[in-house]
Design a protein with these regions (language model features):
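Conserved N-terminal glycine/acidic-rich loop preference
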Residues: 85-88, 94, 134-166
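Radical SAM enzyme core and accessory elements
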Residues: 171-181
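Conserved AdoMet/S-adenosylmethionine-binding subsite of the radical SAM
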Residues: 1-140
């Protein structure tokens, strides 16, 4: 991490003008994020779960939501509201991604409610429908399937009912192994 910080600092000192994007699981220590202050223009964290039961089961991190809440607060403190250039390109801000998982739309609604009630229009919320069950999902029959359109739409409509207007949604069939990073 220190090598990346040093390289970014040097690049910015030498006139780097493109935005620096920090892609994250959301499970970050605030102390680490503070080292990046002034170097990162756009934070792109996940916010995977609100439920400690789900985060313990699927990510072995029962404290995921508490860690992610603290990390997100630091990210937003550093970047402020999302700012775009004249062509609509994001220049600074935080875009929080949430992957809606099959069978857990209530947890997704809890995530969206937390994000919107806490940050309103300071952040953009990206609701993703691309959950793809990989071979290990066979160990968890409840998530060993793709997300239905009904489940995803229910979360999207819930976000809209809260007043979320700044964000991104996915249309169509995006759950293919060919698009998994």
């Amino acid at each position: 991490a220190l090598q990346i910080i040093e390289a970014l600092s040097r690049a910015k000192d030498n006139g780097l003008v493109i935005p620096v994007v920090y892609n994250s699981s959301g499970y970050e220590h605030v102390k680490t994020l503070r080292l990046l202050e002034g170097l990162v223009d756009i934070y792109l964290p996940d916010f995977k779960y609100m439920s400690p039961i789900l985060s313990a089961k699927y990510s072995h991190a029962p404290d995921y939501s508490e860690m992610a809440k603290k990390a997100l607060a630091e990210m937003v403190r550093q970047t402020g509201e999302c700012r775009f250039d004249e062509s609509g390109m994001l220049k600074k801000g935080t875009v929080v991604r949430h992957l809606v998982m099959p069978g857990y739309i209530k947890d997704s609604m809890n995530v969206v409610e937390y994000l919107y009630s806490t940050y309103k229009d300071q952040i953009y919320i990206s609701l993703m429908n691309q959950y793809t069950p990989l071979p290990r999902a066979a160990d968890y029959p409840e998530i060993n399937r793709r997300l239905t359109t009904y489940e995803y739409d229910k979360v999207v409509f819930y976000a809209l009912s809260l007043g979320v207007t700044d964000g991104y949604i996915q249309k169509g069939k995006t759950a293919k192994e060919s698009i998994i990073p």
